[in-house]
Amino acid sequence: MARMTDASPYLDFDRDTWRALRKSMPQVLTANEVEKLRGIGDRIDLTEVAEVYLPLSRLIHMQVEARQKLTAATEAFLGNPPTHVPFVIGVAGSVAVGKSTTARLLQVLLERWESHPKVDLVTTDGFLYPTAYLKEHGLMQRKGYPESYDRRALMRFVTDVKSGKPLVTAPLYSHVSYDIVPGEFQEVRQPDILILEGLNVLQTGPTLMVSDLFDFSVYVDARVDDIEKWYIDRFLKLRHTAFREPGAHFASFADMTDEEAYVQAREIWQSINLPNLIENILPTRVRASLVLRKGSHHLVDRVRMRKL
C-alpha cells in the first residue's frame, strides 16, 4: 500500500509498491530500444522500464482517456461537434538528473497505446534566447535561468498546440553549437499528447504560465550531491563525444586532463547550475503531479504522486 498522511498532498510509494501498479501491462520495449533512449550517465534498463515507467505510462494513459471523455461530454452538453484537445505533460528537473531520458521514454511508451498514438516531444531549449541576445543583455552566465528564455514565445507555442491549431512550430536548439539553429523548426501537428521537457516548465508567476496548461507533470528528483556527481561525470565523458564535434562550442574543453575537466565542471556547477537548481527549479517540485526520486545509483527508488 502507498504511505499516506493527511498532512501531505502526496501518496508515497516505495519501488516494490509502485511496480505492482504495472498490473498485467506487457513490456513493449526491447533492450536495443532502451539503449537508444538512454542519455549519457543514465542507467535505465528493461527492469527500470518495467518497474517504474510502465506503471507511470499506465497512469497517464488512464488520465488521458478520462480527459478525452470529459472533453467529449462537455462538447456534447454545449451541442458542439467533437474537438481535439491535446493532453499536455510537463517534465522538469535539474540538469544531469535524467529528465530528457524520462521524457523520451514516456513518448515511446505512450505512443504504443491505441487511443493516443501521436505523441510529440518538445524541449524548452529551443525557446532560449539566441547566444547573441544573451551576450548583449549580459545573460550568458544565466543561461538556463527563467530570464534566459523567450517565455512569451513558449507560452504562445503551448497555447496554440492546446487550442488545436493544425500546425505549430518550435525553434530548434543545438547542444553542439550551444545556440538556436537559425531557420530550423520542429513541426507539431495536432498531437494526441504533447510532452514539454525543460528545467523551468513548472514555474509559476503573477500571470498565466505554461505550467497552468499542463494536464499532468513529472519532476525528476535526486539529492543535490548526487546530481553534482552525475553532472561532472557527464562533463568528463562529453570531452570524447560532443565537445569534439565540428563547430562545438565547448571544443576548448575536449583536450583537458581529467583533473582540469573536473575543476572546470565543478566550477560551472557551483556558479551556474547549482544556484539555478536551488533558486528556480527545486521550488517548483511541489507543483508536480508526480515526483520520481532517484537514488545515488541513478535509478528511481521512490515515487510520490499528488492526491487527486
Curated annotation (Swiss-Prot):
A GO molecular function held by the record: ATP binding
Keywords (A to Z) from UniProt: ATP-binding, Coenzyme A biosynthesis, Cytoplasm, Kinase, Nucleotide-binding, Transferase
Main enzyme class: transferase
A Pfam family the protein falls into: PRK
EC number(s) recorded for this UniProt protein: 2.7.1.33
Main location, first listed in the record: cytoplasm
InterPro entries with a match to the protein in the record: P-loop_NTPase (IPR027417), PanK (IPR004566), PRK/URK (IPR006083)
Subcellular location: Cytoplasm
SUPFAM superfamilies reported for this sequence: P-loop containing nucleoside triphosphate hydrolases
UniProt catalytic activity: (R)-pantothenate + ATP = (R)-4'-phosphopantothenate + ADP + H(+)
Pathways per UniProt: Cofactor biosynthesis; coenzyme A biosynthesis; CoA from (R)-pantothenate: step 1/5
Gene3D superfamilies: P-loop containing nucleotide triphosphate hydrolases (3.40.50.300)
One of the GO BP terms on file: coenzyme A biosynthetic process
Binding site for ATP: G93, S94, V95, A96, V97, G98, K99, S100
Cellular component terms per the entry's GO annotation: cytoplasm
Family: Belongs to the prokaryotic pantothenate kinase family.
Protein name as annotated: Pantothenate kinase
Organism: Corynebacterium aurimucosum (strain ATCC 700975 / DSM 44827 / CIP 107346 / CN-1)
